[in-house]
From Swiss-Prot:
GO molecular function, one term: proton-transporting ATP synthase activity, rotational mechanism
Membrane-related topology note: Peripheral membrane protein
Segment forming the signal sequence: none
Broad class of the protein's primary localization: membrane
EC number: 7.1.2.2
GO cellular component: plasma membrane; proton-transporting ATP synthase complex
Enzyme kind, highest EC tier: translocase
Role description: Produces ATP from ADP in the presence of a proton gradient across the membrane. The catalytic sites are hosted primarily by the beta subunits.
Designated name of the protein: ATP synthase subunit beta
Gene: atpD
Keyword Heme belongs to the record: no
Record flagged with keyword Transport: yes
Amino-acid positions noted as binding ATP in the UniProt annotation, renumbered to this chain: G152, G153, A154, G155, V156, G157, K158, T159
Length: 467
């Protein structure tokens, strides 16, 4: 099952086999030397181009490759380690450990190309997934086995929200998480690893990185590497796993690069003609089965803030909820900087979350929307010109805004205030009370950076004593 390289075009390599034709997605190994240093390269078959020749995508840089170099077919696709051993470690696309630690001891390996669960194995019941983050649980709740898009620019706190979710899943649901860095900056990946180490969540998460400087094959397939690790925990261990993909746009982008190099005719805006089916192939595997679930949070970069761009548009079709981070909210010092009016969820429906939750959430949104509408009047004429009714709305909206902030466990190191996990019951009680006017006499400051409503009352007492 040996072949020879006949052509190298950047990350695309053509290989000629004499008596064997490897299947699509089969892995091929190349061992060669660069200036006396041995190098191992993995290729993946992407197309058959006639006469027992195949066109492949390289999973690493191809410098130093020459025509005539020997290639060995594996007879199977890329396989990566799965199971408890992968927790706390960093892997590359082909499943090699890249954190400088010891190699894994005889790990179980699974192929990264797997079929999505069949209809009969999928679970159809919609359950809410409690995150312990007030603004998310109240206004844009996540569903178990659902897909969430996390939208935000640079520096508004996407990574901190991701780390807090990993923390809460690890400690409250005693579950595991998998993080796939797709086209990540190496620095960000490095920071994330060290921050997780410091905040004590590293031993509950597996990290897979395909960085920005790597060829498109590695950046594309890394999403499957991470997903395969998550699928093992779901299917073999029956767990509810959290899967993070940062950034899903880079998955589509790397597919576009590969498509052009493989000689396919580009589609709208230069993207690959197979964009929708490639996205579907990945997203359909992220689902709940009767054994367990994979809930995914996907950071979405929106090129030039254009939501109609084919790449983000292809993601929208798959999302159940969107969490939008807003710089203006971050500037007010309200963290997490989730936009309560822009974030949406498919399960914010009385039939799923119940009448009580639905009424409270819509009540909060109405008050915040009214406050937003009144802001121009306040800016020009001041608060005194408002009617008594409007003044009351503004005061309650400001309390709600402050109460939507929350101290995070993973930010304790920086803020000095202990993190808080707020149950859905506490969240609903607090916001219902504010809407009903129970806490109109309590100063606004008491609502800022606390957990449940009991803490607001304690903080108000402290403020009173210090006054």
């Amino acid at each position: 099952m040996e072949g020879r390289i006949t052509q190298v075009m950047g990350p695309v390599v053509d290989v000629d086999f004499d008596s064997y034709l490897p299947a699509i997605n089969e892995a091929l190994d190349v061992n060669y030397d660069i200036e006396g240093h041995p190098k191992k390269l993995v290729l993946e078959v992407a197309a058959h181009i006639g006469d027992s020749r195949v066109r492949t995508i390289a999973m690493d840089m191809t410098e130093g490759l020459t025509r005539g170099t020997k290639v060995v077919a594996r007879g199977k696709s890329i396989e990566v380690p799965v199971g408890e051993q992968v927790l706390g470690r960093i892997f590359n696309v082909v499943g090699d450990v890249i954190d400088g630690g010891d190699e894994l001891k005889e790990p179980v390996k699974w192929s990264i190309h797997r079929t999505a669960p069949t209809f009969e194995n999928q679970s159809t019941k919609t359950e809410m997934f409690e995150t312990g983050i007030k603004v998310v649980d109240l206004l844009a709740p996540y569903s178990k086995g659902g897909k969430v898009g996390l939208f935000g620019g640079a520096g508004v706190g996407k990574t901190v929200v991701i780390m807090e979710l990993i923390h809460n899943v690890a400690f409250k649901h005693s579950g595991y998480s998998v993080f796939a860095g797709v086209g990540e900056r190496t620095r960000e990946g490095n920071d994330l690893y060290h921050e997780m180490k410091e905040s004590g969540v590293l031993d509950k998460v597996a990290l897979c990185y395909g960085q920005m400087n790597e060829p498109p094959g590695a950046r594309n397939r890394i999403a499957f590497t991470g997903l395969t690790m998550a699928e093992y925990f779901r299917d073999e261990k029956g767990l509810d796993v959290l899967m993070f993909i940062d950034n899903i746009f880079r998955y589509a982008q790397s597919g576009a690069e590969m498509s052009a190099l493989l000689g396919r005719i580009p589609s709208a805006v230069g993207y690959q003609p197979t964009l929708a089916s490639e996205m579907g192939k990945l997203q359909e595997r992220i689902t709940s089965t009767k054994k367990g679930s994979i809930t995914s949070v996907q950071a979405v970069y929106v090129p030039a803030d254009d939501l109609t761009d084919p790449a983000p548009a292809s993601v929208f079709a798959h999302l159940d909820a969107t969490t939008v981070l807003n710089r203006k909210i971050a500037e007010k010092g309200i963290y997490p900087a989730v936009d309560p009016l822009d974030s949406t969820s498919r399960i914010l429906d009385p039939q799923v979350v119940g009448e009580d939750h639905y009424k409270t959430a819509t009540g909060v949104q109405q008050v915040l929307q009214k406050y937003k509408d009144l802001q121009d009047i306040i800016a020009i004429l001041g608060m005194d010109e408002l009617s008594e009714e409007d003044k009351r709305v503004v005061e309650r909206a400001r309390r709600i805004e402050k109460f939507l902030s929350q101290p995070f466990f993973v930010a304790e190191v920086f803020t000095g205030s202990p993190g808080k996990y707020v149950t859905l019951q506490e969240t609903l009680e607090g916001f219902k009370g504010i809407l009903e006017g129970k806490y109109d006499q309590i100063p606004e400051n008491a609502f800022y950076m606390v957990g449940g409503i009991d803490e607001v009352l304690e903080k108000a007492e402290r403020l009173k004593a210090n006054a």
